[in-house]
Amino acid sequence: MEIEILSLFPDYFDSPLRSSILGKAIKNGLLKIQSRDIRDFGLGKWKQVDDAPFNNDGMLLMAEPVVQAIRHIKRSDSRVIHLSPQGKPLTAQKSRELAKCSHLIFLCGHYEGIDERALESEVDEEISIGDYVLTNGGIAALVVIDALSRFIPGVLGNQESAEKDSLENGLLEGPQYTRPRVFEGKEVPEVLLQGDHQAVARWRKQVSLDRTRERRPDLYIRYLYDRENEEVFPREEDTKQSTLEGESAVVLEVEDLQRSRKFYSKMFRLNQPSKDKLQIPGRTQMVLHLQEVGLKNKNTAILSLRLDCEDDFFSFLGRWKMLGGTLEQADDHGTVRLVRDFDGHQWTISYKKVK
């Protein structure tokens, strides 16, 4: 793969590209990376590349030098990327896609940015590495290059490690441990020491789910949404199997039994609910067992519900809010929503995607 970086400070990249894994990849011919100075295409005797923007403060990179720089190195197989907080977020999937390109051009902004006409004319896509502003786009370019390089065969000593790293399956990676078994009184989880590979795999998956749900709810709801046909269950301690009816039964510890029964009866439009057992309609065959525990600390449950269509989805959310529940984080497309009831039990509500 060939990568070219357009920047006002081409020397900025020298040290990172000589070091560590990227340096080895370049040395071994797996990557060819060159940084170029936009000032080489500046205007006039003084190679001017920036000017004051109309009706604004600061300085802006001019359209002509940027366009000339891009066209000078652009090929038929080139993909031009502008690093900007206005771009789409960098993800593992995007890194995989970029790793398949043969020639990438990274355009690094400086000052107040770049004249919009240059972007409209020459840029194929904009990528953001986060919701914050940097002193220059060079840092972002290095982040993207590092992320995509992991998916180029031969760059990593063990390509399998790239597939197992955090976020590659849509979830955060769980904790890792090495020797000694006990450090300052903290022990390595026993399951990792028993040699049961299936038990370890189950433990890692559960810890990964829990950590993602707690630390990155945005990733968690995206994970649930992207895996439409995969069952994602509540945590084991919150779920039991009904031997009589063979249905998924979830125990919800509540402060006020009457209040919670009224809330869920109205939410799911149940005409004659029993005192503490609510049968949720639909194909899920879920039964909620309400257990009154008063003001003591409750074990909160994590549940998911997929509705048949968009109208049902928004109707459900409207009822939830009207009845006193809280609406929390939504995914980027608004098709998945986290909600909570009076007692803090969390539901992931989504609807089926139209194929």
From Swiss-Prot:
Gene3D superfamilies: 2,3-Dihydroxybiphenyl 1,2-Dioxygenase, domain 1, 3.40.1280.10, tRNA(m1g37)methyltransferase, domain 2. It comes from the Bacteria. GO terms for molecular function: tRNA (guanine(37)-N1)-methyltransferase activity. Homodimer. Signal peptide: none annotated. It comes from Chlamydia caviae (strain ATCC VR-813 / DSM 19441 / 03DC25 / GPIC) (Chlamydophila caviae). One of its GO terms (biological process) is tRNA N1-guanine methylation. Keywords: Cytoplasm, Methyltransferase, S-adenosyl-L-methionine, Transferase, tRNA processing. Belongs to the RNA methyltransferase TrmD family. It catalyses: guanosine(37) in tRNA + S-adenosyl-L-methionine = N(1)-methylguanosine(37) in tRNA + S-adenosyl-L-homocysteine + H(+). Its main location: cytoplasm. This is tRNA (guanine-N(1)-)-methyltransferase. One of its GO terms (cellular component) is cytosol. PANTHER family: TRNA (GUANINE-N(1)-)-METHYLTRANSFERASE (PTHR46417:SF1). It holds the Pfam family tRNA_m1G_MT. Coiled coil: none annotated. Its EC number is 2.1.1.228. It is found in: Cytoplasm. The lineage of its organism: Bacteria, Pseudomonadati, Chlamydiota, Chlamydiia, Chlamydiales. InterPro entries: Alpha/beta_knot_MTases, Glyas_Bleomycin-R_OHBP_Dase, tRNA_m1G_MeTrfase_C_sf, tRNA_m1G_MeTrfase_TrmD, tRNA_m1G_MTases_N, tRNA_MeTrfase_TRMD/TRM10. Specifically methylates guanosine-37 in various tRNAs. HAMAP family: TrmD (MF_00605).
